[in-house]
């Protein structure tokens, strides 16, 4: 698979051009090799990083599954989920993100953690990317789609037809339930887990 961490066509040299900026946010790696490292995130309201407490609970469930795993992070944003997985022992991670500021922060985080050789960054629409995957292509897949819109429902429907990972987990509003094998609620946020048959 082509590595795209340094694709000049999709790289932002100056995020100010996009009417926003990338800064060192309050998102941090929770455990593992990079524990405590802060991650750059886009400044503004276009992305919504997963809260630390939600990620901590999320990974306590997937702790064994991520070790040595091929990981997919859809709607990756700053890459917090995939980078957490790599910190906890995942073998590789593919990140899929379409927004330029989020991509800029993601690329900066991968570079800072020196993870270029274990990551592939795809500038693509997450749903279109997922449609091209093969069954079982990944061990673990994460998704954190925008709360507004139909992306979560469409992605889950796609996974039911084509289970591209052994374990698929998706963040969504707690008041918008998603049918799955297991759902955990954390205040207004929920994470639903779906396992390939």
Where are these regions (language model features)?
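Class I S-adenosyl-L-methionine-dependent methyltransferase catalytic core
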Residues: 2-197
